[in-house]
Amino acid sequence: MATLWRLSVLCGARGGGALVLRTSVVRPAHVSAFLQDRHTPGWCGVQHIHLSPSHQASSKAASLHWTGERVVSVLLLGLLPAAYLNPCSAMDYSLAAALTLHGHWGIGQVVTDYVRGDALQKVAKAGLLALSAFTFAGLCYFNYHDVGICKAVAMLWKL
């Protein structure tokens, strides 16, 4: 972690003594938290910069989630042509699961990035979970009671 301990700036009218600040501009988070209540003379209303995030997630969980997203994306690349070449109920249900999971994770990232506020984000994620569950249930219902996803797409292409 790069730390800047001294900074030479023009700050004040006292001449050479005021040119060199004896305080750090960027401190490690533990030092910054320790010195948070201390007032630094000559440093006008500048807050400390924290270098570590306030909420840290497990790097293993994030890595596994990222890997899972990539596996589903690559699986879809092979599953779509296979469903075209061999339309059957196994392909229909595989497509239903993979497309729903892929859409859930993608829209979940949009919710995480753009929905602000803890309560609103929880409501949006609950709504997304309900939407994904209804989507999967609807696709499974369509596969069981109608022609299935593969044959439905083929019928649309024949129009």
From Swiss-Prot:
One Pfam family it belongs to: CybS
Localisation: Mitochondrion inner membrane
One GO term (biological process): mitochondrial electron transport, succinate to ubiquinone
Main location: mitochondrion
Regions crossing the membrane: 64-85, 91-111, 121-142
Coiled coil: none
Keyword field: Electron transport, Heme, Iron, Membrane, Metal-binding, Mitochondrion, Mitochondrion inner membrane, Transit peptide, Transmembrane, Transmembrane helix, Transport, Tricarboxylic acid cycle
Assembly notes: Component of complex II composed of four subunits: the flavoprotein (FP) SDHA, iron-sulfur protein (IP) SDHB, and a cytochrome b560 composed of SDHC and SDHD.
Function: Membrane-anchoring subunit of succinate dehydrogenase (SDH) that is involved in complex II of the mitochondrial electron transport chain and is responsible for transferring electrons from succinate to ubiquinone (coenzyme Q). SDH also oxidizes malate to the non-canonical enol form of oxaloacetate, enol-oxaloacetate. Enol-oxaloacetate, which is a potent inhibitor of the succinate dehydrogenase activity, is further isomerized into keto-oxaloacetate.
Protein name (Swiss-Prot/TrEMBL): Succinate dehydrogenase [ubiquinone] cytochrome b small subunit, mitochondrial
Gene name for this UniProt entry: SDHD
